[in-house]
Amino acid sequence: LNPGDEFSFNKIVGERTPEKGYQSAIVYQTGGKSEAEAGGGVCQVASTIYTACLYADLKVTERAPHMFTVTYVQLGMDATIYWGSLDYKFVNSTDHPMRIDASVSGGYVHIKLVGTAPKDKGYDHIVLRHEVVATVQPKMEIDGDKTIITDAGTALDENGNTVNIVVDKDGNKYIKGDMVQYSYVGKTVMAYRDYV
């Protein structure tokens, strides 16, 4: 990646399809749904590149967080991508060419940005700090007949899929139509601020 060149995840990786060997895994979709789709989970790679870019102090030109928190990086360190709508992009904002080395081992994605570190930055290294600035409880809505509360929260089923939890007027909780015998407290969503 030459100085001033922009990296686009979607342009480099291309569309994720079964024909290209991408397996099906869960993706977050518009409206809060999560469904299996070819290339699901590839956001983990985009998020790892994003983190590397932050530590390298490169200029990020396009990045969007997921609609839900993810577990594979700290809050605010994720980068979601979706073919045709969401991309992750950054610019080589150094004065020297750089390359991206990517590998997988032991179930982990490793990203190295290899290049010449600028000498005029005035610091030796970068520390990322996270601060929770607010928490928001799960949204609840009562349907027309006031018997079902929807969007009471989400949970992961035995396959790792996100499922909605429905609570009836008596406080009974259901997941995928089956009554569950345990209490569930919905995950809170946290607003955060990142510092570089």
Annotated model-derived regions:
Residues 1-196:
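Well-ordered beta-sheet/strand-loop patches within structured domains
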